[in-house]
Amino acid sequence: MSKSIENDTWIYVIVKSAGSNDHLAGLHDDVDNLNFIPCFFEKDHAGTCLAHMFDNGKDAYEVQAILYEELSSYAKKNGFMVYILDFKGNIINKIKP
């Protein structure tokens, strides 16, 4: 199923909690040699993928909702692509903000 994503669409991202220095968690796509921020349409999908993508046992991560417009702005400013993923971590869409 493909959903439309607009600036006012709420999506879910993974945030690395570092006290007062929380930030969006990003990954590197070795195939395309790009840094990206994974995002999800469903909170439980983000939670499922969090355990597989980021749980290293020492850093704290959590799922948070964000407006796509804010995510896109953050990604553009910091040189990231935005990848929309499904519950298995498969790429649904790659977006250059």
Predicted regions mapped to residue ranges:
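Conserved NAD+-utilizing ADP-ribose enzyme module
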Residues: M1-P97
